[in-house]
């Protein structure tokens, strides 16, 4: 079957949101997710779940949305002019986890499906998604584990899949105005419809499970690591980069805002607290400097 089964994708994404929320709730051991069901005037809606002030996670948001429209916003047609004049559906699950302990990295993942149709023409559809990790204090074993997990889930789909999507992730989650990466990357893919629907959908499912396999062991390793005000201040400073990326560069944020998405859900990815400091420059031999020197520059973690 090479025609997309939209209702099957929808059911999978709803179940995925349940699975991820259950896993994060168990990892936190304190707070629970609160749910908002919402409708979009132009068509569609979603289910937003947010956990706040837990034992481990300061904030975690897991959002499901399925939206419809008669015409695409500029953010979608800018690099795909053939989509102009088509109606569309977009659905996906997106999540961001902001831990309280600065030694636990922030993580982000999403999987999404998009289809654009018009009478008398074949539908144009694709999957996209991925996951990426944003440490504040880097640990070599965590970075290696994260990327080995990513490579392992890609391997059944071909030898070139991990290096291609790893490179794409490094390129995408990069703050051009700062000339620095947001984190240590992971996987990023878009416009995936080859070789067929079943294979592309299977890869999306593998990425979804791979995120939990990659992230939860890191949370478990670092959640009891002692920390103080110095680490907290650096975490808040680095969260500022997260805000900058999402508001300036992220295509998903722009699409959500330009397409009339629910603003509270679109901006759910924002950290609850962040700060900026003019011309911050960490001491050369400090753990903070090590993040910039040893972790943010793109590298091949599989060779470590």
From Swiss-Prot:
Pathway assignment reads:
Porphyrin-containing compound metabolism; protoporphyrin-IX biosynthesis; protoporphyrinogen-IX from coproporphyrinogen-III (O2 route): step 1/1
Q: Where is this region: Important for dimerization?
A: 242-277
Q: Which residues form the signal peptide?
A: none
Identify the EC number(s).
1.3.3.3
Positions binding a divalent metal cation in this chain are 98, 108, 147, 177
The record lists the catalysed reaction(s) as:
coproporphyrinogen III + O2 + 2 H(+) = protoporphyrinogen IX + 2 CO2 + 2 H2O
Residues in the active site? 108 (proton donor)
Q: Please tell me where this protein is predominantly located.
A: cytoplasm
The keyword Methyltransferase is annotated on this UniProt entry: no
Q: Which BP terms from GO are recorded?
A: protoporphyrinogen IX biosynthetic process
Q: What top-level branch of life does the organism fall under?
A: Bacteria
Report residues binding substrate: 94, 110-112, 260-262
Q: What does this protein do?
A: Involved in the heme biosynthesis. Catalyzes the aerobic oxidative decarboxylation of propionate groups of rings A and B of coproporphyrinogen-III to yield the vinyl groups in protoporphyrinogen-IX.
* Oligomeric form and interacting partners: Homodimer.
> What is the protein name stated in its UniProt record?
Oxygen-dependent coproporphyrinogen-III oxidase
Source organism of the structure? Sodalis glossinidius (strain morsitans)
């Amino acid at each position: 079957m090479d025609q997309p089964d939209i209702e099957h994708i929808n059911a999978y994404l709803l179940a995925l949101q349940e699975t991820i929320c259950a896993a994060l709730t168990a990892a936190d051991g304190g707070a629970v997710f609160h749910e908002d069901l919402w409708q979009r005037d132009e068509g569609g809606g979603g289910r937003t779940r947010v956990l706040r002030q837990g034992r481990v996670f300061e904030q975690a948001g897991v959002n499901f949305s399925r939206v419809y429209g008669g015409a695409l916003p500029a953010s979608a047609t800018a690099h795909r002019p053939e989509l102009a004049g088509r109606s569309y559906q977009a659905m996906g699950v997106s999540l961001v986890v902001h831990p309280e302990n600065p030694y636990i990295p922030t993580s982000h993942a999403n999987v999404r499906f998009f289809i654009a149709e018009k009478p008398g023409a074949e539908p144009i559809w694709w999957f996209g998604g991925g996951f990426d990790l944003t440490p504040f204090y880097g640990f070599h074993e965590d970075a290696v584990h994260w990327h080995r997990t990513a490579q392992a889930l890609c391997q059944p789909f071909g030898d070139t899949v991990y290096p291609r999507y790893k490179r794409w992730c490094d390129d995408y989650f990069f703050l051009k105005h700062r000339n620095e990466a947001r984190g240590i990357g992971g996987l990023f893919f878009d416009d995936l419809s080859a070789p067929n629907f079943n294979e592309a959908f299977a890869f999306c499912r593998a990425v979804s499970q791979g995120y939990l396999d990659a992230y939860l062991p890191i949370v478990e390793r670092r959640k009891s690591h002692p920390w103080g005000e110095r680490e907290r201040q650096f975490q808040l400073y680095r969260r500022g980069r997260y805000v900058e990326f999402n508001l300036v560069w992220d295509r998903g944020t722009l699409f959500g805002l330009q397409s009339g998405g629910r603003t509270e859900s679109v901006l759910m990815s924002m950290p609850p607290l962040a700060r900026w400091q003019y011309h911050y420059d960490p001491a050369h031999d400090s753990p903070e400097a090590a993040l910039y020197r040893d972790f943010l520059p793109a590298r091949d973690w599989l060779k470590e």
